[in-house]
């Protein structure tokens, strides 16, 4: 329209509700693929040449900010910015092509692209997609991701669902659950971090792992999680400690769309509920006179 004169086409991946739209600029995703196949047949070298022509500091994608502190902005990030951050954290966490990831968050969000797609280019791990938004929890249990990201609201929703089921359980099962969780809150995070715990508590925790913690991780779909992150908003300390106490290596990170997500990440052995960890390799942070956090590293936002 008049506000976007350079816009030539709008591609829609779900045609439902668009039956009566006849504007020539509206394309279905299937039609776009068909056009691409036809063009590739007529110009067999085009796509290979286009890829070869890309430079590290060319624009790779545009992601929109949330708009919580102002109008949403379109953040342009380069190939170098995305790959650099993906590689830094993949190396830090020893991510390999053996990881399984569940891509269930909105694809327009920078976090989804980084955790599920950009790090895929660096590591070659397997990205799994849920069958539908309604089957995410079921698919998560079936897939058993080893590398996982969830905002606090998702973690809270998963826990609420489990706790509701537990309240419907029998008296003895509820009694056992609460006794095991009391122990987990006291020693679980210390065991996860490899700290010293007396033999009696270790033995009791191992028994609790068989009876409660293991089945609970399985019910959450996290029985195979090796590394899990949360970010996007502050997570309550009780919620954070709960997941870590049952043996899930949940960690916090800090970043933004403009920084390609990763600014600070909690390394193993330095996980606390009141910090977001030290700067990732290649990042410098300084607090300005006005209290703002100033971030410096190669490949920040290219432009708005």
For each feature predicted by the language model, list its residue ranges:
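Conserved pre-ATP/AMP-binding loop-to-beta segment of ANL
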Residues: 12, 27, 34-64, 71, ...
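Short hydrophobic/charged patches on amphipathic alpha-helices used for structural packing
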Residues: 48-51, 137, 217
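Active-site charged/polar residues at nucleotide-handling catalytic sites that mediate phosphoryl
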Residues: 5, 142-143, 223
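Conserved AMP-binding/adenylate-forming
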Residues: 204, 208-304
């Amino acid at each position: 329209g008049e506000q976007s004169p350079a816009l030539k086409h709008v591609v829609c991946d779900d045609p439902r509700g668009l039956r009566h739209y006849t504007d020539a600029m509206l394309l279905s995703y299937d039609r776009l693929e068909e056009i691409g196949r036809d063009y590739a047949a007529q110009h067999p070298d085009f796509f290979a040449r286009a890829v070869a022509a890309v430079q590290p500091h060319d624009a790779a994608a545009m992601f929109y900010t949330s708009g919580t502190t102002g109008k949403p902005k379109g953040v342009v990030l380069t190939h170098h910015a995305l790959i650099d951050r993906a590689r830094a954290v993949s190396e830090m966490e020893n991510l390999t092509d053996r990881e399984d990831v569940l891509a269930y968050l909105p694809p327009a969000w920078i976090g989804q692209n980084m955790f599920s797609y950009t790090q895929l280019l660096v590591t070659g791990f397997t990205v799994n997609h849920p069958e539908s938004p309604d089957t995410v929890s079921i698919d998560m249990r079936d897939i058993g991701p080893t590398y996982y990201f969830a905002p606090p609201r998702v973690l809270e929703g998963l826990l609420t669902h489990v706790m509701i089921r537990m309240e419907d359980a029998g008296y003895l099962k509820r009694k056992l659950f609460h006794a095991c969780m009391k122990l987990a809150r006291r020693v679980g995070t210390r065991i996860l971090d490899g700290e010293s715990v007396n033999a009696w508590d270790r033995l009791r925790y191992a028994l609790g792992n068989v009876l409660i913690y293991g089945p609970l991780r399985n019910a959450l779909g996290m029985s195979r999680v090796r590394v899990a992150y949360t970010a996007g908003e502050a997570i309550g300390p009780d919620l954070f400690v709960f997941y870590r106490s049952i043996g899930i290596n949940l960690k916090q990170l800090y970043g933004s769309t403009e920084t390609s997500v990763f600014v600070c990440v909690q390394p193993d052995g330095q996980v606390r509920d009141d910090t977001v960890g030290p700067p990732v390799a290649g990042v410098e942070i300084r607090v300005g006179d006005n209290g703002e956090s100033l971030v410096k590293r190669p490949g920040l936002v290219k432009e708005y």
